Amino acid sequence: MDKMFLVQGDMVGVSFWLVSIAMVASTVFFLYEGLRVKPQWRLSLLVAGLVTLVAGVHYDYMRDFWVVNQSTPIDYRYIDWLITVPLLMIEFFIILRAVGGAVGAGSFMRLLVGTLVMLVFGYAGEAGLMGYWLGFGLGMIGWAVIIYEIYGGEAGKAAASSSESVQSAFNAMRWIVLVGWAIYPIGYVAGAALGGENNLNIIYNLADFVNKILFGLIIWNLAVKDSGDTAH
């Protein structure tokens, strides 16, 4: 049982611990705040809370896996991403629908397909089911599909016709996907180029901390602003 405790100086284990606690705290925050905003925003905050809840549970398992094995919890991490990343993509769709944006189901399907391509090939590369760099390249194609859809596709065009506050939040969310998500391929490359699982896991943990929590905070900020004095 002693192996289940963090070893002093294990910075990777510490990063797993910090992210797991941050995810749990964020979940409580998002779910509580969802009770104080307009009804049309409650689903968005519920989804944000689900993202951090699922991530928090998986990080608890990933932390223990790392402490015991001192190796990358690939399966746990990708199971987490297969659940949470599609939920993040759903947020784009929900926000536009909440403000009456004209966006069809096709937009969501393209975001979903891009997400699955990105994750499935990323996992295949890291798990050794195909060439490491081939999996990386094919996964990047999925990311490119997502970027196109939220910038130049139907979702991006629907956001452009929305209110200024929605455009501001949507742009911030797009920047997270464009810039914040770039941390993930950096971690993927670091796992091979720098030859260490420590670098890969710390970078991945940092990316999840920034992208999942900050993503939800942007939605919360928009929901509170739009709710105004009606929030209670």
Which residues does each PLM region occupy?
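Non-cytosolic membrane-interface motifs at loop->transmembrane helix junctions
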Residues: V68-I79, M130-L138, E197-A207
